[in-house]
């Protein structure tokens, strides 16, 4: 049996205010009362879903990266979420996978949200990221990537857990609540989606709806509307049994 303990933080965000967001997150994370293997924050957790990278983008040695390392070291776990990064004259919506020792991996959002003009301000990534944690193979992606099942296809059982960080608006929450279980069932993997709550600077409301779905489509965790810092465990045996009983992959 291989258990993975995950802490998801469905949080309010302060619009385009890096310092205030990091200060708030630091305070709220102190509510974690048990050990955890992984802390998951939403997409652009330090700014909100902003199309203002010229003002907000940081380098890979910036304050938000340093903050992630501080939290990973403090809680002795991986910390992940996406931030705005500038690199070689391009801006990226970049997910950071930060370990306690300061080593990290990253994933640049592949599918940019054209309806929100994200493609006009950011450069798309080209490669998937697969990471390992406590014997689990994990594939982290960002928000709009959820709508592209071919990109997420678990062709060679490359992952046991698909992880989605998001700023997904309430007006399309039905899609979020439908697609996450679909990705879990078709890929015979756990799927964890972590969204924000509240209004952003464009008055777009986010209802959260963070969730964990097992490979059979069973709901392990679901939280609409309110801010929530929640820790739960998932069992890799569920993945093994699902794939053995229904060898579809």
Write out the residue ranges for each language-model feature.
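Structural motif
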Residues: 37-38, 138, 161
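Cys-nucleophile CN-hydrolase/nitrilase-fold catalytic domain and related Cys-dependent amidase chemistry
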Residues: 18-19, 23-100, 105, 169-182, ...
